[in-house]
Amino acid sequence: MSTVCLSMIVKNETHIIHECLESMWNKIDYWVIVDTGSTDGTQELIKKFFADKGIPGELHERPWVGFGVNRSEALALCDGKADYAWMIDADDKIEGDFRYPNNKNLVADGYALKCGRDQCIWWRNQIFKTGIGWKYTGILHEYANCDKQPIHQEKIEGNYHLEARTLGNRNVNITQVEKYTKDAEMLLQALETDPTNSRYQFYLAQSYFDSQQWDKATEAYYKRVEMGGWEEECYYSLFRVALVAMSQQKDWAIIQQKLLDAYDYRPCRAEPLHIIARSLRMMGRVRAACMFAKQAAQIPHPPQDILFIDTNVYRWMALDEVGSTAFYTHEYQTGYAVCAKLLKENLLPPSEIERVRKNLEAYTQKLQEIEAANRAAQQAQAEAVKLQTPASPTESKSSYIPPRAARFKQRK
């Protein structure tokens, strides 16, 4: 069985680190934590926590240089202490049922974990084989690379995620706009000396987006796309350009075209089509909405993608758009099937169950009305044949329900 050493860099984390350590202590055999200048008692909290748990380890104190340098130093200090090092931020924590593969008999050089925030997931290397030269690169949004080449990397699947909370010391006493404005300034300066660094360019655009500098974000995203390279990052840049246009309340025709640009770039991603479907439905354009919703619902969760995937779109939201619009296109059987699937397979969050149940009832009633009308028509036709007189058409007594009908519920 492989041994695992917890690896962290910390500074003034007493307000948040206990939750992280509680989620990690039963998954490790040793710990090596580097403090970069805490003045709030973080060091004592860490030592007491692990002493109470009976887990050996060591605390080092080092001056702050930068994320890449300090993380690399923390990883190097794990060499010889365990077979693997698990790097985690003080404000992150493991949620769910995490299990090591192969009963903790680890074989890969590195393992990517499923990270999440709100509806979004992404995969990131967090567990590294020690002694083979893993290092972090970058001033912000740093990433791990390895001296050993080629390397064997795997994902650890399962019903868990690493909750990325952005609640650490870097987020204290500062607004999100201020934080990401500072990040943008740092990345812009870094790009002056390394202008071909596509990762810096992408996170410059992200920082502009998160600091609500919309025009700069659009320009930076398009520049990232022009640089080429990783297709997922280019796709997401185009997708965010569309979200910027939505934030700026631009004309729908412009927004829709930008969403279609993102979809055309990476048609295995359903998020752009889902937004189009939902937006059209809210405009009352239910037939067009249903068309886009059905296309989005046909796209499975992309198993090969690792960057910023809205899992709810693939789990239930695209299907729900079909269920919310098929009634108005007279595709009652389709709407019934979708609502039944959402309920039967427990795909919905609790807040949506009653609404979808009412929609299923509306579809059921409509299908029963159609079936009754068909039976009546068939019976009338049979009677007419007996009398050897021409059959007269029978109209359904049910009427078209307009989009604002009270008995059919749409998601807001």
Where are the language model's segments positioned?
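Conserved donor nucleotide-binding strand/loop of the catalytic core
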Residues: 44-73, 77
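Structural motif corresponding to the intra-repeat A-B loop/turn of tetratricopeptide repeats
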Residues: 211, 248-249, 283, 329, ...
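Residue at a conserved register position within TPR or TPR-like alpha-solenoid repeats
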Residues: 208, 245-246, 280, 326, ...
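"A position-specific structural signal for the A-helix of alpha-solenoid helical repeats
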Residues: 203, 240, 275, 282, ...
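Catalytic-site signature of metal-activated, phosphate-bearing donor transferases
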Residues: 68-75, 82, 86-88, 92-219, ...
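Short, well-formed alpha-helical segments that are part of the catalytic scaffolds
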Residues: 7-30
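A conserved acidic beta->alpha catalytic loop
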Residues: 23, 27, 34-46, 63-64
